[in-house]
Amino acid sequence: MERTCLAIILAAGESTRMKSAMSKVLHPVAGRPMIAHVVDALASASISDVALVVGRDADAVSAAAATDEVAVTSFLQKERLGTAHAVLAAREAIAKGYDDVLVVFGDTPLITAAPLKAARDGLAAGNDVVVIGFQATDPTGYGRLIVKDGALVAIREHRDASDEERRITYCNGGLMAIDGRKALDLLNRIGNANAKGEYYLTDLVEIARSLDGRAIAVEAPEEELTGCNTRAELAYIERLWQQRRRHELMLAGVSMIAPETVFLSWDTALAQDVLLEPNVVFGPGVRVESGAVIHAFSHLEGAHVRAGATVGPFARLRPGADLGAKSKVGNFCEVKNAEIGAGAKVNHLTYIGDAFVGAGSNIGAGTITCNYDGVNKHVTRIGANAFVGSNSSLVAPVSIGDGALVASGSVITEDVPADAVAFGRARQDVKPGRAPILRERYEAEKAARKRAKAAE
Protein backbone atom coordinates (compact mmCIF):
# COMPACT_ATOMS: atom_id res chain seq x y z
CA MET A 1 0.00 0.00 0.00
CA GLU A 2 1.35 3.42 -0.91
CA ARG A 3 2.53 5.53 2.01
CA THR A 4 0.67 8.74 2.75
CA CYS A 5 2.59 11.99 3.08
CA LEU A 6 1.95 15.48 4.37
CA ALA A 7 4.33 18.16 3.14
CA ILE A 8 4.67 21.24 5.31
CA ILE A 9 5.91 24.36 3.53
CA LEU A 10 7.36 27.02 5.83
CA ALA A 11 6.53 30.39 4.27
CA ALA A 12 5.80 32.68 7.21
CA GLY A 13 9.06 34.64 7.34
CA GLU A 14 9.13 38.43 7.44
CA SER A 15 11.52 38.61 4.44
CA THR A 16 13.32 41.57 6.03
CA ARG A 17 16.54 41.20 4.06
CA MET A 18 14.61 41.13 0.79
CA LYS A 19 13.69 44.79 1.36
CA SER A 20 10.40 44.37 -0.44
CA ALA A 21 6.77 45.34 -0.05
CA MET A 22 5.81 41.67 -0.47
CA SER A 23 6.87 38.34 0.96
CA LYS A 24 9.98 36.89 -0.64
CA VAL A 25 8.16 33.69 -1.62
CA LEU A 26 5.99 35.77 -3.96
CA HIS A 27 8.96 37.02 -5.95
CA PRO A 28 9.09 35.38 -9.38
CA VAL A 29 11.63 32.90 -10.63
CA ALA A 30 11.21 32.15 -14.33
CA GLY A 31 7.95 34.06 -14.38
CA ARG A 32 6.08 32.56 -11.43
CA PRO A 33 6.26 32.92 -7.63
CA MET A 34 9.06 30.88 -6.14
CA ILE A 35 6.64 29.12 -3.79
CA ALA A 36 4.79 27.75 -6.82
CA HIS A 37 8.02 26.02 -7.88
CA VAL A 38 8.19 24.33 -4.47
CA VAL A 39 4.58 23.12 -4.73
CA ASP A 40 5.31 21.79 -8.22
CA ALA A 41 8.27 19.78 -6.89
CA LEU A 42 6.04 18.29 -4.20
CA ALA A 43 3.46 17.30 -6.79
CA SER A 44 6.20 15.67 -8.88
CA ALA A 45 7.19 13.66 -5.79
CA SER A 46 3.63 12.23 -5.65
CA ILE A 47 2.69 14.22 -2.54
CA SER A 48 -1.00 15.05 -2.53
CA ASP A 49 -1.46 17.00 0.72
CA VAL A 50 0.31 20.24 1.65
CA ALA A 51 0.13 22.31 4.82
CA LEU A 52 1.25 25.84 4.04
CA VAL A 53 2.46 27.82 7.06
CA VAL A 54 1.92 31.50 6.33
CA GLY A 55 2.45 34.82 8.05
CA ARG A 56 3.12 37.97 6.11
CA ASP A 57 0.92 38.41 3.01
CA ALA A 58 -0.94 35.25 4.01
CA ASP A 59 -3.73 35.53 1.45
CA ALA A 60 -1.39 36.30 -1.45
CA VAL A 61 0.99 33.49 -0.49
CA SER A 62 -1.90 31.03 -0.24
CA ALA A 63 -3.17 32.09 -3.65
CA ALA A 64 0.28 31.70 -5.21
CA ALA A 65 0.61 28.18 -3.83
CA ALA A 66 -2.82 27.03 -4.98
CA THR A 67 -2.83 24.34 -7.66
CA ASP A 68 -5.00 21.56 -9.03
CA GLU A 69 -2.16 19.08 -8.52
CA VAL A 70 -2.18 18.98 -4.70
CA ALA A 71 -4.54 19.97 -1.88
CA VAL A 72 -3.06 23.00 -0.10
CA THR A 73 -4.36 24.08 3.32
CA SER A 74 -2.99 27.23 4.95
CA PHE A 75 -2.09 27.64 8.63
CA LEU A 76 -1.23 30.99 10.18
CA GLN A 77 1.88 31.29 12.34
CA LYS A 78 1.12 34.22 14.62
CA GLU A 79 4.53 34.36 16.32
CA ARG A 80 8.00 33.68 14.92
CA LEU A 81 9.62 31.34 17.45
CA GLY A 82 11.77 29.11 15.28
CA THR A 83 11.41 26.41 12.65
CA ALA A 84 9.90 23.77 14.95
CA HIS A 85 7.34 26.30 16.19
CA ALA A 86 6.47 27.03 12.55
CA VAL A 87 5.97 23.33 11.81
CA LEU A 88 3.64 22.99 14.79
CA ALA A 89 1.44 25.73 13.36
CA ALA A 90 0.20 22.86 11.18
CA ARG A 91 -0.45 20.64 14.21
CA GLU A 92 -4.02 19.95 13.07
CA ALA A 93 -2.80 18.52 9.76
CA ILE A 94 0.01 16.51 11.35
CA ALA A 95 -2.46 14.94 13.78
CA LYS A 96 -4.35 13.29 10.91
CA GLY A 97 -1.80 10.49 11.02
CA TYR A 98 0.16 10.51 7.78
CA ASP A 99 2.90 7.93 7.29
CA ASP A 100 5.41 10.62 6.36
CA VAL A 101 5.76 14.29 7.23
CA LEU A 102 8.05 16.27 4.95
CA VAL A 103 9.21 19.78 5.90
CA VAL A 104 10.37 22.12 3.14
CA PHE A 105 10.94 25.85 2.72
CA GLY A 106 8.98 28.21 0.50
CA ASP A 107 12.13 30.00 -0.65
CA THR A 108 13.92 27.01 -2.25
CA PRO A 109 12.48 27.07 -5.78
CA LEU A 110 15.24 24.91 -7.25
CA ILE A 111 14.31 21.81 -5.27
CA THR A 112 13.30 18.81 -7.38
CA ALA A 113 11.37 15.65 -6.65
CA ALA A 114 14.44 13.39 -6.40
CA PRO A 115 15.72 14.35 -2.92
CA LEU A 116 12.16 14.53 -1.59
CA LYS A 117 11.54 10.97 -2.75
CA ALA A 118 14.90 9.90 -1.28
CA ALA A 119 13.93 11.34 2.09
CA ARG A 120 10.62 9.47 2.03
CA ASP A 121 12.42 6.29 1.04
CA GLY A 122 14.56 6.77 4.15
CA LEU A 123 11.45 6.79 6.31
CA ALA A 124 10.07 3.73 4.53
CA ALA A 125 13.30 1.93 5.44
CA GLY A 126 12.53 2.39 9.14
CA ASN A 127 14.27 5.65 10.04
CA ASP A 128 12.55 8.21 12.24
CA VAL A 129 14.17 11.36 10.88
CA VAL A 130 15.76 11.98 7.49
CA VAL A 131 17.66 15.21 6.88
CA ILE A 132 18.38 16.41 3.35
CA GLY A 133 21.95 17.67 3.13
CA PHE A 134 24.47 18.76 0.54
CA GLN A 135 28.19 18.86 -0.10
CA ALA A 136 29.02 22.55 0.29
CA THR A 137 31.52 24.29 -1.94
CA ASP A 138 32.15 26.61 1.02
CA PRO A 139 30.70 25.18 4.25
CA THR A 140 31.35 28.30 6.32
CA GLY A 141 28.28 29.21 8.34
CA TYR A 142 26.35 26.00 7.65
CA GLY A 143 25.41 23.38 10.21
CA ARG A 144 27.51 20.24 9.72
CA LEU A 145 25.96 16.79 9.43
CA ILE A 146 27.83 14.43 11.75
CA VAL A 147 27.44 10.95 10.29
CA LYS A 148 28.81 7.77 11.90
CA ASP A 149 28.34 4.28 10.49
CA GLY A 150 25.61 5.54 8.18
CA ALA A 151 23.61 7.17 10.96
CA LEU A 152 23.18 10.90 11.46
CA VAL A 153 24.19 11.49 15.07
CA ALA A 154 24.01 15.30 15.23
CA ILE A 155 23.67 18.56 13.37
CA ARG A 156 26.43 20.81 14.64
CA GLU A 157 26.08 24.54 14.06
CA HIS A 158 29.21 26.18 12.68
CA ARG A 159 29.77 28.30 15.78
CA ASP A 160 29.65 25.21 18.01
CA ALA A 161 31.72 22.90 15.79
CA SER A 162 35.23 21.75 16.63
CA ASP A 163 38.06 22.32 14.20
CA GLU A 164 37.72 18.73 13.01
CA GLU A 165 33.97 19.09 12.53
CA ARG A 166 34.41 22.34 10.62
CA ARG A 167 36.40 20.42 8.03
CA ILE A 168 33.24 18.46 7.22
CA THR A 169 31.63 19.65 3.98
CA TYR A 170 28.40 17.68 4.35
CA CYS A 171 25.97 20.37 5.48
CA ASN A 172 22.38 20.70 6.61
CA GLY A 173 20.02 21.79 3.84
CA GLY A 174 17.16 22.43 6.26
CA LEU A 175 14.65 20.11 4.61
CA MET A 176 13.59 17.14 6.70
CA ALA A 177 11.32 14.10 6.70
CA ILE A 178 9.80 12.75 9.93
CA ASP A 179 8.00 9.51 10.73
CA GLY A 180 4.39 10.67 10.71
CA ARG A 181 3.37 8.31 13.52
CA LYS A 182 5.92 9.89 15.84
CA ALA A 183 6.02 13.43 14.46
CA LEU A 184 3.87 15.20 17.06
CA ASP A 185 5.57 13.47 19.98
CA LEU A 186 9.02 14.35 18.66
CA LEU A 187 8.09 17.94 17.85
CA ASN A 188 6.49 18.48 21.26
CA ARG A 189 9.76 17.46 22.93
CA ILE A 190 11.74 20.28 21.32
CA GLY A 191 12.64 22.95 23.86
CA ASN A 192 13.80 26.54 23.61
CA ALA A 193 16.71 26.56 26.05
CA ASN A 194 18.98 28.55 23.76
CA ALA A 195 20.20 32.12 23.40
CA LYS A 196 17.26 33.16 21.20
CA GLY A 197 14.59 31.25 23.08
CA GLU A 198 13.44 29.59 19.85
CA TYR A 199 12.37 26.06 18.93
CA TYR A 200 14.73 24.52 16.37
CA LEU A 201 13.73 21.67 14.07
CA THR A 202 17.33 20.44 13.96
CA ASP A 203 16.99 19.26 17.58
CA LEU A 204 14.87 16.37 16.26
CA VAL A 205 17.97 14.38 15.36
CA GLU A 206 19.26 14.09 18.91
CA ILE A 207 15.76 13.77 20.38
CA ALA A 208 14.98 10.82 18.10
CA ARG A 209 18.27 9.13 18.99
CA SER A 210 17.65 9.66 22.70
CA LEU A 211 14.44 7.66 22.27
CA ASP A 212 16.31 4.80 20.54
CA GLY A 213 15.23 6.07 17.14
CA ARG A 214 17.43 6.46 14.10
CA ALA A 215 18.24 9.45 11.92
CA ILE A 216 20.01 9.48 8.57
CA ALA A 217 20.96 12.05 5.94
CA VAL A 218 20.36 11.92 2.20
CA GLU A 219 22.25 14.10 -0.23
CA ALA A 220 20.90 16.62 -2.75
CA PRO A 221 22.82 18.85 -5.16
CA GLU A 222 23.86 22.08 -3.46
CA GLU A 223 22.01 24.26 -5.96
CA GLU A 224 18.68 22.57 -5.22
CA LEU A 225 18.84 23.69 -1.60
CA THR A 226 19.73 27.30 -2.36
CA GLY A 227 17.54 29.60 -0.30
CA CYS A 228 16.59 33.17 -1.10
CA ASN A 229 16.95 36.04 1.36
CA THR A 230 18.18 38.96 -0.75
CA ARG A 231 17.75 40.37 -4.25
CA ALA A 232 21.27 39.19 -5.06
CA GLU A 233 20.34 35.63 -4.10
CA LEU A 234 17.15 35.93 -6.15
CA ALA A 235 19.22 36.84 -9.21
CA TYR A 236 21.57 33.91 -8.49
CA ILE A 237 18.63 31.49 -8.23
CA GLU A 238 17.20 32.82 -11.50
CA ARG A 239 20.55 32.21 -13.18
CA LEU A 240 20.76 28.66 -11.86
CA TRP A 241 17.18 27.92 -12.94
CA GLN A 242 17.80 29.27 -16.44
CA GLN A 243 21.03 27.27 -16.82
CA ARG A 244 19.32 24.07 -15.75
CA ARG A 245 16.34 24.52 -18.05
CA ARG A 246 18.44 25.53 -21.06
CA HIS A 247 20.56 22.42 -20.59
CA GLU A 248 17.47 20.20 -20.42
CA LEU A 249 16.05 21.71 -23.61
CA MET A 250 19.30 21.40 -25.55
CA LEU A 251 19.57 17.74 -24.55
CA ALA A 252 15.99 17.35 -25.82
CA GLY A 253 16.92 18.67 -29.28
CA VAL A 254 16.56 22.45 -29.09
CA SER A 255 19.41 24.45 -30.64
CA MET A 256 20.61 27.62 -28.93
CA ILE A 257 23.43 29.57 -30.55
CA ALA A 258 24.20 31.53 -27.38
CA PRO A 259 22.27 29.78 -24.60
CA GLU A 260 23.39 32.17 -21.90
CA THR A 261 21.43 34.95 -23.65
CA VAL A 262 18.14 33.03 -23.89
CA PHE A 263 15.66 33.53 -21.04
CA LEU A 264 12.87 31.04 -20.48
CA SER A 265 9.71 30.95 -18.40
CA TRP A 266 8.65 28.10 -16.18
CA ASP A 267 6.21 26.75 -18.77
CA THR A 268 8.09 27.47 -22.02
CA ALA A 269 7.52 24.49 -24.33
CA LEU A 270 10.05 24.09 -27.16
CA ALA A 271 9.92 21.12 -29.51
CA GLN A 272 12.81 19.23 -31.08
CA ASP A 273 14.66 21.09 -33.86
CA VAL A 274 13.60 24.55 -32.74
CA LEU A 275 16.43 27.05 -33.31
CA LEU A 276 16.92 30.00 -30.98
CA GLU A 277 19.26 32.80 -31.97
CA PRO A 278 20.87 35.01 -29.29
CA ASN A 279 18.95 37.35 -26.99
CA VAL A 280 15.50 35.78 -27.07
CA VAL A 281 13.11 36.23 -24.13
CA PHE A 282 10.15 33.95 -23.41
CA GLY A 283 7.38 35.16 -21.14
CA PRO A 284 4.85 32.69 -19.73
CA GLY A 285 2.58 30.63 -21.97
CA VAL A 286 4.72 30.07 -25.08
CA ARG A 287 4.70 26.92 -27.19
CA VAL A 288 7.01 26.54 -30.19
CA GLU A 289 6.69 23.57 -32.53
CA SER A 290 9.36 21.65 -34.40
CA GLY A 291 11.47 23.40 -37.02
CA ALA A 292 10.53 26.92 -35.99
CA VAL A 293 13.24 29.58 -35.88
CA ILE A 294 13.23 32.42 -33.37
CA HIS A 295 15.66 35.06 -34.57
CA ALA A 296 17.67 37.38 -32.34
CA PHE A 297 16.18 39.97 -29.98
CA SER A 298 12.64 38.61 -30.10
CA HIS A 299 10.20 38.64 -27.18
CA LEU A 300 7.40 36.06 -26.96
CA GLU A 301 4.62 35.80 -24.40
CA GLY A 302 1.42 33.76 -24.47
CA ALA A 303 2.09 32.74 -28.07
CA HIS A 304 1.89 29.57 -30.17
CA VAL A 305 4.45 29.25 -32.97
CA ARG A 306 3.66 26.32 -35.21
CA ALA A 307 5.98 24.03 -37.14
CA GLY A 308 8.47 25.70 -39.46
CA ALA A 309 7.41 29.28 -38.67
CA THR A 310 9.98 32.04 -38.25
CA VAL A 311 9.93 34.97 -35.84
CA GLY A 312 12.09 38.09 -35.85
CA PRO A 313 14.64 39.42 -35.51
CA PHE A 314 13.36 42.16 -33.19
CA ALA A 315 9.79 40.81 -33.15
CA ARG A 316 7.26 40.81 -30.34
CA LEU A 317 4.55 38.19 -29.94
CA ARG A 318 2.01 39.08 -27.28
CA PRO A 319 -0.68 36.89 -25.66
CA GLY A 320 -3.01 35.27 -28.15
CA ALA A 321 -0.56 35.32 -31.05
CA ASP A 322 -0.92 32.10 -33.07
CA LEU A 323 1.46 31.67 -36.00
CA GLY A 324 0.58 29.01 -38.55
CA ALA A 325 2.96 26.48 -40.05
CA LYS A 326 5.74 28.09 -42.12
CA SER A 327 4.37 31.57 -41.52
CA LYS A 328 6.69 34.50 -40.91
CA VAL A 329 6.63 37.46 -38.56
CA GLY A 330 9.69 39.55 -39.33
CA ASN A 331 11.70 42.43 -37.93
CA PHE A 332 10.04 45.14 -35.84
CA CYS A 333 6.62 43.50 -35.99
CA GLU A 334 4.15 43.05 -33.15
CA VAL A 335 1.36 40.48 -33.11
CA LYS A 336 -1.28 40.40 -30.36
CA ASN A 337 -4.37 38.18 -30.06
CA ALA A 338 -4.14 37.36 -33.74
CA GLU A 339 -4.00 34.28 -35.92
CA ILE A 340 -1.47 34.27 -38.75
CA GLY A 341 -2.38 31.56 -41.26
CA ALA A 342 -0.06 28.92 -42.66
CA GLY A 343 2.54 30.40 -44.99
CA ALA A 344 1.39 33.98 -44.41
CA LYS A 345 4.04 36.71 -44.20
CA VAL A 346 4.15 39.74 -41.94
CA ASN A 347 7.66 40.80 -42.77
CA HIS A 348 8.45 44.31 -41.56
CA LEU A 349 7.39 47.15 -39.26
CA THR A 350 3.83 45.96 -38.78
CA TYR A 351 1.23 45.75 -36.00
CA ILE A 352 -1.35 42.97 -36.22
CA GLY A 353 -3.76 43.00 -33.27
CA ASP A 354 -7.15 41.33 -32.78
CA ALA A 355 -6.99 39.94 -36.29
CA PHE A 356 -7.14 36.90 -38.54
CA VAL A 357 -4.70 36.69 -41.45
CA GLY A 358 -5.49 33.94 -43.93
CA ALA A 359 -3.08 31.34 -45.25
CA GLY A 360 -0.62 32.57 -47.85
CA SER A 361 -1.42 36.26 -47.40
CA ASN A 362 1.30 38.92 -47.54
CA ILE A 363 1.13 41.96 -45.27
CA GLY A 364 3.31 44.84 -46.46
CA ALA A 365 5.71 46.92 -44.39
CA GLY A 366 4.16 49.52 -42.12
CA THR A 367 0.68 48.00 -42.10
CA ILE A 368 -1.39 48.63 -38.99
CA THR A 369 -4.62 47.02 -37.88
CA CYS A 370 -6.38 49.91 -36.14
CA ASN A 371 -8.15 47.76 -33.57
CA TYR A 372 -8.95 50.22 -30.75
CA ASP A 373 -11.45 53.08 -30.86
CA GLY A 374 -10.53 54.40 -27.44
CA VAL A 375 -13.12 52.25 -25.69
CA ASN A 376 -13.47 48.88 -27.44
CA LYS A 377 -11.30 46.50 -29.43
CA HIS A 378 -12.43 45.44 -32.92
CA VAL A 379 -11.43 42.61 -35.24
CA THR A 380 -9.75 42.73 -38.65
CA ARG A 381 -10.24 39.71 -40.93
CA ILE A 382 -7.94 39.16 -43.89
CA GLY A 383 -8.68 36.23 -46.17
CA ALA A 384 -6.35 33.70 -47.75
CA ASN A 385 -3.81 34.76 -50.38
CA ALA A 386 -4.60 38.45 -49.95
CA PHE A 387 -2.02 41.21 -50.41
CA VAL A 388 -1.93 44.36 -48.29
CA GLY A 389 0.42 47.02 -49.63
CA SER A 390 2.93 48.90 -47.51
CA ASN A 391 1.91 51.68 -45.13
CA SER A 392 -1.76 50.71 -45.04
CA SER A 393 -4.14 51.28 -42.13
CA LEU A 394 -6.94 48.76 -41.71
CA VAL A 395 -9.59 50.39 -39.52
CA ALA A 396 -11.46 47.66 -37.66
CA PRO A 397 -13.99 46.22 -37.75
CA VAL A 398 -13.18 45.43 -41.36
CA SER A 399 -12.79 42.40 -43.63
CA ILE A 400 -10.59 41.84 -46.65
CA GLY A 401 -11.63 38.90 -48.80
CA ASP A 402 -9.63 36.02 -50.22
CA GLY A 403 -7.25 37.07 -52.97
CA ALA A 404 -7.99 40.79 -52.51
CA LEU A 405 -5.35 43.46 -53.06
CA VAL A 406 -5.03 46.63 -50.98
CA ALA A 407 -2.95 49.35 -52.61
CA SER A 408 -0.03 50.86 -50.70
CA GLY A 409 -0.81 53.80 -48.46
CA SER A 410 -4.50 52.99 -48.18
CA VAL A 411 -6.76 53.67 -45.23
CA ILE A 412 -9.35 50.89 -45.41
CA THR A 413 -12.60 51.58 -43.56
CA GLU A 414 -14.99 49.37 -45.54
CA ASP A 415 -15.00 45.66 -46.34
CA VAL A 416 -13.08 44.59 -49.44
CA PRO A 417 -14.65 41.69 -51.39
CA ALA A 418 -12.69 38.66 -52.53
CA ASP A 419 -10.37 39.30 -55.50
CA ALA A 420 -11.11 43.06 -55.43
CA VAL A 421 -8.54 45.85 -55.54
CA ALA A 422 -9.01 48.61 -52.95
CA PHE A 423 -7.52 52.12 -53.07
CA GLY A 424 -8.08 54.15 -49.94
CA ARG A 425 -5.85 57.21 -50.38
CA ALA A 426 -6.06 60.78 -51.68
CA ARG A 427 -5.31 61.40 -55.36
CA GLN A 428 -1.76 62.65 -55.98
CA ASP A 429 -1.56 66.30 -57.14
CA VAL A 430 1.63 67.40 -59.00
CA LYS A 431 2.45 71.12 -59.49
CA PRO A 432 5.32 71.54 -62.00
CA GLY A 433 7.98 74.14 -61.09
CA ARG A 434 6.51 74.91 -57.67
CA ALA A 435 9.42 73.49 -55.61
CA PRO A 436 11.86 76.48 -56.09
CA ILE A 437 9.12 78.95 -55.08
CA LEU A 438 8.39 77.04 -51.87
CA ARG A 439 12.09 76.62 -51.13
CA GLU A 440 12.66 80.40 -51.50
CA ARG A 441 9.79 81.13 -49.13
CA TYR A 442 11.10 78.68 -46.53
CA GLU A 443 14.61 80.20 -46.68
CA ALA A 444 13.19 83.70 -46.18
CA GLU A 445 11.20 82.55 -43.15
CA LYS A 446 14.31 80.93 -41.69
CA ALA A 447 16.39 84.10 -42.18
CA ALA A 448 13.69 86.21 -40.52
CA ARG A 449 13.72 83.97 -37.46
CA LYS A 450 17.50 84.30 -37.18
CA ARG A 451 17.32 88.12 -37.36
CA ALA A 452 14.61 88.22 -34.71
CA LYS A 453 16.65 86.02 -32.41
CA ALA A 454 19.79 88.15 -32.90
CA ALA A 455 17.84 91.32 -32.02
CA GLU A 456 16.72 89.93 -28.65
UniProtKB/Swiss-Prot annotation:
GO terms for cellular component: cytoplasm; membrane. Gene3D superfamilies: Hexapeptide repeat proteins, Spore Coat Polysaccharide Biosynthesis Protein SpsA, Chain A. One of its GO terms (biological process) is UDP-N-acetylglucosamine biosynthetic process. Binds 1 Mg(2+) ion per subunit. Keywords: Acyltransferase, Cell shape, Cell wall biogenesis/degradation, Cytoplasm, Magnesium, Metal-binding, Multifunctional enzyme, Nucleotidyltransferase, Peptidoglycan synthesis, Repeat, Transferase. It is found in: Cytoplasm. UDP-N-acetyl-alpha-D-glucosamine binds at residues 10-13, 24, 77, 82-83, 143, 157, 172, 229, 318, 336, 351, 362. Mg(2+) binds at residues 107, 229. Its cofactor is Mg(2+). PROSITE patterns: HEXAPEP_TRANSFERASES. InterPro entries: Bifunctional_GlmU, GlmU-like, GlmU_C_LbH, Hexapep, Hexapep_transf_CS, MobA-like_NTP_Trfase, Nucleotide-diphossugar_trans, Trimer_LpxA-like_sf. Its EC number is 2.7.7.23, 2.3.1.157. The active site is at 348 (proton acceptor). GO terms for molecular function: glucosamine-1-phosphate N-acetyltransferase activity; magnesium ion binding; UDP-N-acetylglucosamine diphosphorylase activity. Residues 1-231 are annotated as: Pyrophosphorylase. Acetyl-CoA binds at residues 365, 371-372, 390, 408, 425. NCBIfam families: glmU (TIGR01173), PRK14353.1 (NF010933). In the N-terminal section; belongs to the N-acetylglucosamine-1-phosphate uridyltransferase family. Catalyzes the last two sequential reactions in the de novo biosynthetic pathway for UDP-N-acetylglucosamine (UDP-GlcNAc). The C-terminal domain catalyzes the transfer of acetyl group from acetyl coenzyme A to glucosamine-1-phosphate (GlcN-1-P) to produce N-acetylglucosamine-1-phosphate (GlcNAc-1-P), which is converted into UDP-GlcNAc by the transfer of uridine 5-monophosphate (from uridine 5-triphosphate), a reaction catalyzed by the N-terminal domain. This is Bifunctional protein GlmU.
